[in-house]
Amino acid sequence: MKTTTSKSSIQNLEEVLKRFLTNKNTFSLCNGEKENLKANLYELLSKLYDNYQLACIDINQIWVYETCYYTFTFESLVTVDRPRENIIADGCIRFMQNFTDGDGIFISFTKLDKNPWVYQLNFRIS
């Protein structure tokens, strides 16, 4: 059973959020808005980590016409079997709903690796 990653999850989350806001975010935000977005994501992703043992390892976002697409990649701190996969998928849907204030439209929740601990959540907001 897989247990932990090498860096602390808080340090990893800080790095992921910084990378997203600096390089991968297509919003035109002032510094205050970026800080609010970072704080909101930090709080929601920390809850996901605490409740489901899912560490966010990457975030991508892109605008296509009037629609914003998000991809969040997670690493589970424990090996995920089928019942647990359903539980963490539910947690990710709750995260999406909280992050988008209920406006997000679910696209997929997918295992990315043959090893059962890397998952990707995809959703959009129109």
What is each residue range found by the language model?
Residues 56-117:
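Acidic, low-complexity, intrinsically disordered interaction modules
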Residues 1-67:
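N-terminal leader/targeting segments
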Residues 118-125:
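Short, low-order "capping/linker" segments at domain edges
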